[in-house]
């Protein structure tokens, strides 16, 4: 789904301000602002609201693994900026468990990203 195709609809988006800013950027090229009907903290609440016709929810794709209802449609947003960025944060002075060290190594390897230390 292209962001411009969402303009006629009421949208339900995550409550975090950073997510609203990201979603607003998807619509910059359209010359129009989306109609944000609600900002919902929990994606399952947004799912229920969408199920009952309140609006279209914009949430991480991971919610699709939780949905078993045939009355709900899940589509990917087709925009280069339609992705979430995350950071791993840990205390440098704290000794991490073996599992934590392995997880960090895995993330570094899979992402190809450099780890930055503050």
Roles of regions detected by a PLM:
Residues 9-30, 96-100, 104, 114-118:
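Secondary-structure junction motif
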Residues 106-110:
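C-terminal alpha-helix
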Residues 1, 10-20, 62-64, 79-80, ...:
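Short coil/turn segments
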Residues 13, 32-45:
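Short beta-strand-to-loop elements that line the ligand-binding cleft
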Residues 13-16, 39, 57, 89:
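Active-site-adjacent beta-strand anchor residues
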Residues 31-32, 67:
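Short helix-capping segments at alpha-helix termini
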Residues 5, 44-93, 102:
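Beta-alpha-beta core module
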């Amino acid at each position: 789904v292209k962001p411009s195709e969402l303009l006629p609809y009421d949208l339900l988006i995550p409550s975090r301000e950073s997510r609203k800013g990201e979603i607003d950027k998807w619509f910059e090229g359209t010359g129009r602002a989306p109609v944000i009907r609600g900002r919902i903290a929990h994606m399952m609440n947004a799912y229920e609201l969408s199920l009952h016709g309140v609006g279209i929810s914009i949430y991480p794709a991971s919610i699709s693994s939780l949905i078993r209802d045939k009355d709900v449609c899940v589509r990917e947003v087709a925009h280069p900026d339609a992705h979430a960025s995350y950071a791993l944060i840990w205390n440098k002075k704290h000794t991490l468990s073996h599992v934590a060290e392995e997880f960090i190594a895995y993330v570094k390897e899979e992402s190809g990203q450099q780890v930055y230390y503050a």
